[in-house]
């Protein structure tokens, strides 16, 4: 019953959206993990996998009727927002770099991500994921600043007796 109540809160819905965005961002970059020319994409993949796991664990914690203190929750999500934003920047810079390739004896200079949509899509999802994580951090700060207000990260009714 507690899991159903937890799933109805805006905080939990935001966590689900973050989980999906992290999943999409690392899933589309998965096949670049062993490509030596694109090793900088591994950072985006690793950070998104880490975010995906942490968000999934936190959803389980919320479904069990627990929640982190709002300030700790805000700090964790702010840290991940910064890491995801750095991963976005690394991916965007790598995609805009030029590389020289040799095809049939001809040397061609082109952008790293030219003709490839996966890194661009992953960068876009990482950017949006960073915004969502920053929003989660703001929600944690709001809950910390107003302790008398209903907790945004919890699903328990503050007026009911325990």
Curated annotation (Swiss-Prot):
Localization of this protein: Cell membrane
Top-rank taxon, per record: Eukaryota
InterPro entries noted in UniProt: Marvel
Membrane topology: Multi-pass membrane protein
List of glycosylated residues: 96
Residues in compartment: Extracellular: 33-43, 91-123
CC per GO annotation: plasma membrane
Topology Cytoplasmic: residue spans: 1-11, 65-69, 145-162
Keyword field contains Glycoprotein: yes
Stretches that traverse the bilayer: 12-32, 44-64, 70-90, 124-144
Keyword flag Membrane: yes
Main location: membrane
Subunit structure of this chain's protein: Homodimer and heterodimers.
Family per record: Belongs to the Casparian strip membrane proteins (CASP) family.
Record protein name field: CASP-like protein 0U1
Lineage, opening ranks: Eukaryota, Viridiplantae, Streptophyta, Chlorokybophyceae, Chlorokybales
